[in-house]
From Swiss-Prot:
Name of one Pfam family that matches: Enolase_N
GO CC terms, sorted: cell surface; extracellular region; phosphopyruvate hydratase complex
Catalytic residues of the enzyme: E209 (proton donor), K359 (proton acceptor)
Sites where the protein binds Mg(2+): D250, E307, D334
Gene3D superfamilies for the chain: Enolase-like C-terminal domain, Enolase-like, N-terminal domain
A biological process from GO: glycolytic process
Positions of (2R)-2-phosphoglycerate binding: Q167, K359, R388, S389, K410
Name listed for the protein in its UniProt record: Enolase
Keywords: Cytoplasm, Glycolysis, Lyase, Magnesium, Metal-binding, Secreted
Protein species of origin: Mesomycoplasma hyopneumoniae (strain 7448) (Mycoplasma hyopneumoniae)
Matches recorded under InterPro entries: Enolase, Enolase-like_C_sf, Enolase-like_N, Enolase_C, Enolase_CS, Enolase_N
Pathway, per record: Carbohydrate degradation; glycolysis; pyruvate from D-glyceraldehyde 3-phosphate: step 4/5
Cofactor note: Binds a second Mg(2+) ion via substrate during catalysis.
Record family assignment: Belongs to the enolase family.
Amino acid sequence: MSKITKVFAREILDSRGNPTIQVDVYTLAGGFGSAIVPSGASTGSREALELRDTNTKYADNWYGQKGVMTAVDNVNNIIAPEIIGLCCKNQRLVDQKMIELDGTPNKEKLGANAILGVSLAVAKAAANELRMPLFRYLGGTNPTLMPVPMLNVINGGEHASNTLDFQEFMIMPLGFRTFKEALQAANKVFHNLAKLLKKSGFETQVGDEGGFAPNFNSHEQALDFLVDAIKESGFNPGFKGENAVAIAIDAAASDFYNGQKYVFKKLMAASLSKNQADLDEKFEFSSEELLNYYGQLLAKYPIISIEDGFAESDWQGFIAFNQKYGNNHQIVGDDLTVTNVEILKKAINLKAINSILIKLNQIGTLSETLDAIHLAQKSGMTAVISHRSGESEDTTIADLAVAVSSGQIKTGSLSRTDRIAKYNRLLVIEEYLNSYAKADYIGREVFYNLKK
C-alpha cells in the first residue's frame, strides 16, 4: 500500500480571471499529482455546490467575493488530516471518506471544488507513482478510442456578450481517419470562419470558450456561417462519408426559460425587425413550439447533436424531443442530469435523453463521475466528456475521455490556451497509443446511440 503523505491546496486563477482551487498530493513512494478545478458560468441548479468566500472573513479578497480560500482551508485543515495515510490507489475509499466528511447531498459543507481538487490530485499521484499516463491508470490497457472533438467555434448565451441566446454552435469533424486529421480539419474550418466573418463585416472577438461571438441577427445566421465555413474548407457539411463535418448545438435552454415560456431575450433586445424572414422572427415559444423550431433547424442543417434543448425542469420537453428525434440525433442532458447517477436513472427510465454530458465538478468526485459514465454506457447512452467555461491548463478531461472510451469531448474552440491544452494533450495521447497499438478514430460510429 502506498500511502498519501501530504495534501496541500492553494488559491489560483482560472481562464476568466476568477479564483479557483489547485490541490497537490504526495505519496510515500514518490508519487505526485496536482489538479486545478474548473468552474461553470451556465450551471444547473442541482449541481454540487462550488464554495466561494461570500460572507466570510475572506470576502473582500477578490472582486465579487469570488475567492475560494474557505475551500482551500477545508482541504488543508479538514480533508488532509483525514486522508493522509490512506492508499492513493484506493480512489473510491478516498472519495467516500470525503463524501462522509462533508455529509451533505450537494457537498455544500466542504465544497465540491475542495473535494474534487483532492479527488483528481489523488488519481494523478497514483498514476505518477506507477509511472503511467493518467488515461492508462484510469482505463487500463484496453482503451484506444480517440474522441471526436466538439469545437465551440461560435459562442453565445452566458458565454458571450453578443446577441445569440443559444450558448454554443459547434463543429464535429467526423469523416477523418485520425484525431490529428480531424483536428486539422477543424483548424481549417475555424480559420475560414474567421475569414468569412471579417469579410461580412463582423467582429472576430472570442467568448469564454474561445469561439467567435458576433452579433448575428438570428441563430440561423450563425448556422449559415458554419455551413459556409465547412464548404470553404473543402469539406462536406453532413454526418457520413469522407470529409464530413457535422454541427452540434448547446442551447442551454434553462438560461432563456422564464418558468412558462422560452424567450430569446438577447435576440429580442437587439431590436430586430419584426419583418425578418427567418426562424427568429418569433422570440417566445411554448415547449411544443420550441420542439417544432428545433425540428425546422434539424431539417435544414447538418445538426447531429443538441444539448439542453429544454430547461432542466421541463422533463416533458426532453421526453417529447427524444421520442421524436432521438433515433437520428443525439439528445444530450447537461443541466438536466448534472453528472448525477440518481437523476440519470430517472432520465433513463423516462427515456428523456440518449446522451449525458459529463462534467467533473457537477458531482465533485472522480468515483461518482465514473459511476455516471458507466451507467450511461451500460444503458446505451453516449457520455460526452466536457470542460467548463472557467478552465485552466489542467488536462484531466482529455485523459478521462480516452480512459472511458467516451468517443466525444467538448473542450472549446481552437483559441485560448486553456482550451488548446486539452487538444494538445489528446495529440500526445494519440501518438502514445500509436507507439504501442493503433489509436482508433471512428467518426460517425461514436454515435452508437443512433440508428445507422
